[in-house]
Each structure stands twice: as structure tokens, then as C-alpha cells.
From Swiss-Prot:
The keyword RNA-binding does not apply. It is an enzyme of class 6 (ligase). It is found in: Cytoplasm. The gene is pheS. GO terms for biological process: phenylalanyl-tRNA aminoacylation. It holds the Pfam family tRNA-synt_2d. This is Phenylalanine--tRNA ligase alpha subunit. Belongs to the class-II aminoacyl-tRNA synthetase family. Phe-tRNA synthetase alpha subunit type 2 subfamily. The lineage of its organism: Archaea, Thermoproteota, Thermoprotei, Thermoproteales, Thermoproteaceae. NCBIfam families: pheS (TIGR00468), PRK04172.1 (NF003210). Gene3D superfamilies: 1.10.10.2320, 1.10.10.2330, 3.30.1370.240, Bira Bifunctional Protein, Domain 2.
Length: 489
């Protein structure tokens, strides 16, 4: 005999034949959402048959409800007519919606004469009878004739609604199953007393989709990322994208980062066991990059190591791909994406965060151009207090760290920048141009601009906090961008 959770057993008991799940939920005093996971479990176990049907129905819009209660404009106009000696006359000046009424009466062949609508009494009664039927149809749109329903939809008096109805039916006789107390969690006391032996332990099925609950507001951090994208495109940059699962070549080697560099150890990089397909870098780039490593760093470059899969630690892996593909010239590209590092989670650090990476390529570019470009982007995002400090990065020279001021955390580093070294650009075929490059942590920038002092709050599930942070985001966006006002904390 199969042991089932009590809710699933009750569904089977109440649905010996096909029955809407809504009806079963009413009988059980429950809701469809709370029963859905048991329905999916029953389907997966083969004890419940499930069908989904899309049902169409029609409902009145707000204007439709008003017209159903007060009358259609054309109906009200003709009902106000006065009939004498076989002629019926309605005065347009008495009706504020006369133009709407006339537009719909014109489809019935009725035209005004001056400021009145005049019809012979027989025609008048015939048209009024038609409009009365239409008025009745508006009160019950589900039974309206197709051509009338089509008109109501066009006039935005009625809208079509599609709803997925779930039907269930028991797939096994009731006597072959029995209910039992099902546990998803057991305590140390359950184990010590042996009570766990009397429980049915429910396995977790990650393929079952949970019910969806609409968010009260858009997620502020997603809105922020989209806004950064708009800012960069507005400054003349083109967006490029790359994979999250990278080979070490693009993440490190192409950036002139030696294969024994500490950042390439397991405490700074997530290495991935992966047997699926991975894009191999072009052979000529592998050879030229390996040769530069051996000449400059003076070690034997390991081709096999360069092809190890890693979770990218920097979105520079994507911009360096774009540089290798496009070569010399004049262009500006950027990318926004997630990067991963084995960090300890605290208010300032996370093992998964977002970066804005960009490059500007062209002849004659200097360090002044770089600082000017960085300041332009920072101001476009509303950061009024920015400073630069000299820094070292393996793949840029000269290099700087970029800081912005947070009201509680003080000066917060959110990115690095520099000019790509010849050891980076020349193996990729870039020999006539200089390349300005930077990578910024967007999570920290969002914290600075929105006054958030803990990076974990960017992913909070607290609905009240989401509303609060969205309100801050709305105030921030209203203060920058097209308006031109800089946001100062």
C-alpha cells in the first residue's frame, strides 16, 4: 500500500472522476495554490492524473461597467427622442457624449441633420430595439453574439481573459493508498526517541514549480542595472556579452596574468568540474599569448591549464574577447555581468557580485583620457565625490583604484582601471591603438547611491525593505539622468 501525504490522499478521495481543482479546494477548505505541490507530487508518483485547459471568458472593463449601468451613449441619445406625428427627434445639444453616440449610430446608417437626429417612427423603433438588445448583451458579455462581442472589445468595453484551469482525477483505487504524517524536517529529539521511524520522510523534488507571487514593486537592483546600461549606451558605448563559465585563458592568460599568480589559486577562483562543451580560443592567440608569457614571465606556459574551466572572476574576460575579435580601430564597448570569487560574506564583500567592465580603443589615448572617461561615467551615475589612488594590476600600467564616498562606510573602493599593457594588446593583434580599461563593482555603487550599508541587502527578500529601497531608487533616478541634477548623499 502506498503511503501519501494527507492533502494528496484527500485530493484523490474527492476526485474519483475528472474535477476542477478549484472545486476540490473548496470542498477541502483550502486554496488551489496550497494544493498544487501535492497535485504535482501525485502526478509524478502516478497516483493522480492532471490536465490543464485554457478557458476563455469575457469581463467588463471599468468603462464597460459604467455603460452597462448608465446606458450606451447612442442608446441614451435615441431614448431621449420625442416622437410626434410619425417623426422622432433627438437634440444633440442635450448630450455631452453626442459625438461618441453619432459615431456609433453612423454604423447603423443614422446621420444628424444640423443639431438634431430625426428618424421616422418605424425606423426609430427598429434601431432602439437593436440597441436595447446590445445593451442587454453588454450586461452579460459571455452570451453576447460574436459580432457584438467583437464591437465591445474594439470599443474597450469588454476584455478577453484567458485562464488555465487544472483538472484532476484519481489514477489509483482509494483502497491502494493511505494517508500518513509526512515530515520534511526531523529534529534531534525525533532521532533520539526513535519517533522518526513512524514518519514518512518527504523527498524534495526540485522539478516541481512553486506558486508565483507577484512582487509589490519592481526589484530596485534590477532597475539600477538597467539604468547603468542606459547610461553607458547614452555615452556612446556598445554592449557585449560573454559566458559565465570561462576558460582560464580569457579570464587570466590573455590578461598577462602569470599561471602561478596567487589570484589563480583555489582560494581566489572557483574551479569547475565540467565535461560539457567549452569554446576553445583560436590557435594563433593561444600561441602568441603563450609566447609572451614565456618571454616576459620566464616560465614554461601550460596550455592545458589555460583551458581549465572556471567561473569568471572578472568581466574583463568578456571585454578582452571583444578586443581580440575586433583588433585595432576606434571603438568603445562595455559589459555588465555576474562574477564569482571565494569571498567571506560580510557587509562589504560577497562571493557573487556584478561588474561593469569597459574598454575604449583608439590611437593616441593617454592616462588623462582614462581619468576623464571614468569621471564622466561616475558623474553620469550621480557620484559627486570620487577619487583615484595609484594601484598595481598585472594587465594595466599605469593603474588606479577608484573610490566613492558612502555616508556610513566612508570611502569605498568600487573598481580598478588602467591602460592595457603591450603584453596584453600585442598578442591579440592590437598594435596601433591604446586601450583604456576598467572594471567597477556595481553592487558597491548601488550601495553608495542608495545609502545601503550591507551588500546582502541588495538581495533581501523582505517585502517592506524592497519597497523602501525601490522608493530610494525612484528618488535617485528622478535626481539624475536627463534632468541633469547630480545626486549627493
Amino acid at each position: 500500500m502506498l503511503v501519501l501525504p494527507l492533502p494528496l490522499y484527500e485530493i484523490i478521495r474527492h476526485a474519483p472522476e475528472w474535477k476542477p481543482l478549484e472545486e476540490v479546494a473548496r470542498e477541502l477548505g483550502s486554496s488551489v495554490d496550497s494544493l498544487m505541490r501535492y497535485v504535482e507530487e501525485g502526478r509524478a508518483k502516478g497516483v493522480l492524473r492532471v490536465e490543464r485547459k485554457v478557458i476563455e471568458f469575457y469581463e467588463l472593463t471599468e468603462e464597460g461597467r459604467q455603460r452597462a449601468a448608465e446606458g450606451l451613449p447612442e442608446y441614451k441619445l435615441l431614448k431621449s427622442a420625442v416622437c410626434r406625428e410619425g417623426r422622432c427627434t433627438a437634440h444633440l445639444s442635450q448630450h455631452p457624449e453626442a459625438q461618441i453616440a453619432l459615431a456609433n449610430l453612423a454604423k447603423l446608417g443614422v446621420k444628424p441633420r444640423g443639431n438634431v437626429v430625426e428618424l421616422d417612427e418605424e425606423t426609430y423603433k427598429k434601431i432602439v430595439a437593436m440597441l436595447e438588445e446590445k445593451q442587454k448583451a453588454l450586461a452579460a458579455p459571455h452570451s453576447a453574439p460574436p459580432e457584438v462581442l467583437k464591437e465591445f472589445i474594439k470599443r474597450k468595453l469588454v476584455r478577453k481573459i484567458e485562464k488555465t484551469q487544472v483538472y484532476v482525477k484519481a489514477a489509483v483505487p482509494l483502497e491502494l493508498v493511505k494517508p500518513a504524517e509526512v515530515k520534511t524536517v526531523i529534529t534531534s529529539e525525533d532521532i533520539a526517541t526513535g519517533r522518526w521511524r513512524n514518519y514518512t520522510l518527504k523527498p524534495f523534488d526540485l522539478n516541481i514549480e512553486p506558486p508565483e507571487y507577484p512582487a509589490p514593486v519592481p526589484h530596485f537592483f534590477n532597475e539600477f542595472l538597467d539604468y547603468v546600461r542606459e547610461v553607458m549606451i547614452g555615452l556612446g558605448f556598445e554592449e557585449v556579452r560573454g559566458p559565465v563559465l570561462e576558460v582560464e585563458f580569457w579570464n587570466f592568460d590573455a590578461l598577462f596574468q602569470a599561471q602561478d599568480h596567487p589570484a589563480r589559486e583555489v582560494h581566489d577562483t572557483f574551479y569547475v568540474q565540467w565535461s560539457g562543451p567549452l569554446e576553445t580560443p583560436p590557435e594563433h592567440l593561444m600561441e602568441s599569448v603563450g609566447r609572451v608569457h614565456e618571454e616576459k614571465w620566464r616560465y614554461k606556459w601550460d596550455r592545458k591549464k589555460a583551458l581549465n574551466p572556471v567561473l569568471r572572476t572578472q568581466t574583463t574576460a568578456t571585454t578582452i574577447r571583444a578586443l581580440a575579435e575586433r583588433g585595432d580601430g576606434e571603438y568603445k564597448v562595455f559589459t555588465i555581468g555576474r562574477v564569482f570569487r571565494p569571498e567571506k560574506l560580510d557587509p562589504k564583500h560577497s562571493m557573487e557580485f556584478h561588474q561593469l567592465d569597459g574598454i575604449v580603443v583608439g590611437p593616441g589615448l593617454t592616462f588623462k583620457h582614462l581619468l576623464g572617461q571614468l569621471e564622466e561615467i561616475a558623474k553620469a551615475l550621480g557620484m559627486t565625490k570620487v577619487k583615484f589612488r595609484p594601484a598595481y594590476f598585472p594587465f594595466t600600467s599605469p593603474s588606479v583604484e577608484v573610490y566613492a564616498q558612502h555616508p556610513k562606510l566612508g570611502w569605498v573602493e568600487f573598481g580598478g582601471a588602467g591602460i592595457f599593457r603591450p603584453e596584453v594588446t600585442e598578442p591579440l593583434g592590437v598594435k596601433k591603438s591604446r586601450v583604456l580599461a576598467w572594471g567597477w563593482g556595481l553592487d558597491r555603487i548601488a550601495m553608495i547611491l542608495l545609502g545601503i550599508d550591507d551588500i546582502r541587502e541588495l538581495f533581501t527578500k523582505d517585502l517592506e525593505k524592497l519597497k523602501e529601497y525601490y522608493a530610494r531608487w525612484a528618488r535617485y533616478k528622478a535626481s539624475v539622468g536627463a534632468v541633469g541634477t547630480l545626486f549627493t548623499l
